[in-house]
């Protein structure tokens, strides 16, 4: 695995030839004893798998590593009272300055500073637990983003496959149009229009190819590889219909509320603040969070149902296209249809195949979005 930062050689080199064979891996966020040898080997190979994304993000994502380092240096073990006490002491010092001031400007300045310090103690500073939750939420959102990026990568692959088959049909149509022109059954304008369609098809293929590469680089860099690395990216998992059938917004709501990071953070800050007006603000935030969790869960559930319906429709479309393809194959073999007509049927079949796969991936993504809300992560 070619990692992006903090490289270290994990075995001793015995001679130059042996050194050249030693894998170089990035420093992970966790100590070596945190995982088994087999688990580390799986993460350090040159293969990216969907079910590894969460662990890869945790160990090798630079944002996560930076958050962990910062937390360990500045916030670990720090509670709200530590910060509150610090700023309240500052407020008391400003109060003394205000009492000792000999002019109105100095008095007002000191009183303002005291008020700001009390406000800082009441609302701005966060304790270690709050920051820890924020870091966990940020990490989980990165995992969610990685899942979505990998899903998009494979959806784009399917779109490219369909575009390439469509281009083959378009090119055949250009040749057929030129042949018709030779027998005065097509005009020069018809030929130019067909050629323009071919140029458009080439432009679409180029655009999709670039999008695929951009998406690939985004995926591998956020999981620890260098931008120019070429790890094997394994296929996406199948849709688990049993998991889908178990989705139940009414039953899942309590768990989603219990896990929701934003709700936990706002609830803790509401308990920490002492200023009456700020307490009202945080209490309202908590109430809003509670309501929004239910809305988000129901919206995500509806998206899952819509994605499932679209997938089922695409499956039926593929069955129809398969029958048309079978018929066209027989007709082409006996010479009853032209090559262009055969390519039309073939292009339609490939479009139906890739369309079904895109809908499957969209369903998988919708299911993941629902599950993330249950796990406490809202967009």
Regions found by a protein language model. Name each.
Residues 1-28:
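Sec-dependent N-terminal signal peptides of Gram-positive bacterial secreted proteins and lipoproteins
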Residues 67-70, 74, 120, 138, ...:
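Charged, solvent-exposed structural "stalk/scaffold" segments
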Residues 68, 75, 82, 89, ...:
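Coiled-coil heptad-register positions
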Residues 26-129, 133, 140-146, 150, ...:
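Bacterial Sec-pathway N-terminal export signals of envelope proteins
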Residues 123-130, 164-172, 229-230, 278-280:
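Helix-turn-helix repeat elements of alpha-solenoid scaffolds
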Residues 257, 276-286:
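Extended, charged, solvent-exposed helical/coil segments
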Residues 209-251, 367-379:
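Short, solvent-exposed, mixed-charge loop/turn linkers that connect secondary-structure elements
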């Amino acid at each position: 695995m070619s990692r992006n930062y903090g490289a270290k050689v994990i075995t001793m080199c015995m001679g130059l030839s042996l050194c050249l064979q030693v894998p170089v891996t990035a420093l992970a966020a966790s100590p070596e004893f945190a995982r088994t040898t087999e688990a580390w080997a799986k993460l350090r190979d040159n293969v990216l798998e969907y079910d590894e994304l969460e662990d890869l993000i945790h160990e090798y994502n630079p944002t996560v590593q930076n958050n962990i380092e910062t937390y360990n240096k500045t916030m670990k073990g720090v509670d709200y009272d530590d910060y509150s006490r610090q700023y309240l002491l500052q407020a008391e010092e400003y109060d003394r300055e205000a009492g000792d001031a000999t002019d109105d400007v100095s008095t007002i300045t000191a009183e303002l500073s005291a008020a700001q310090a009390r406000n800082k103690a009441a609302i701005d500073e966060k304790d270690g637990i709050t920051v820890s939750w924020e870091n966990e939420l940020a990490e989980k959102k990165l995992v969610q983003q990685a899942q979505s990026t990998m899903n998009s990568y494979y959806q784009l692959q399917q779109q490219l496959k369909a575009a390439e088959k469509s281009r083959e049909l378009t090119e055949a149509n250009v040749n057929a149009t030129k042949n018709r022109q030779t027998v005065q059954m097509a005009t020069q304008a018809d030929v130019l229009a067909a050629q323009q369609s071919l140029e458009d098809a080439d432009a679409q293929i180029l655009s999709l190819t670039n999008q695929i590469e951009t998406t690939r680089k985004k995926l591998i860099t956020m999981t620890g590889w260098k931008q120019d690395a070429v790890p094997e990216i394994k296929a996406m998992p199948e849709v688990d219909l049993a998991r889908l059938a178990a989705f139940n917004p009414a039953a899942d709501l309590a768990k989603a509320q219990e896990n929701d990071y934003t709700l936990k953070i706002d609830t803790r800050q509401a308990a920490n603040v002492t200023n009456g007006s700020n307490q009202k603000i945080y209490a309202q935030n908590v109430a809003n969070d509670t309501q929004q969790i239910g809305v988000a869960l129901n919206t995500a559930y509806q998206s899952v149902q819509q994605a499932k319906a679209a997938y089922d429709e695409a499956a039926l479309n593929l069955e129809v296209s398969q029958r048309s393809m079978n018929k066209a194959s027989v007709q082409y073999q006996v010479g009853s249809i032209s090559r262009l007509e055969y390519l039309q049927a073939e292009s339609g079949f490939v479009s139906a195949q890739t369309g079904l796969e895109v809908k499957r991936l969209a369903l998988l993504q919708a299911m993941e979005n629902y599950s993330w809300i249950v796990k406490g992560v809202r967009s």
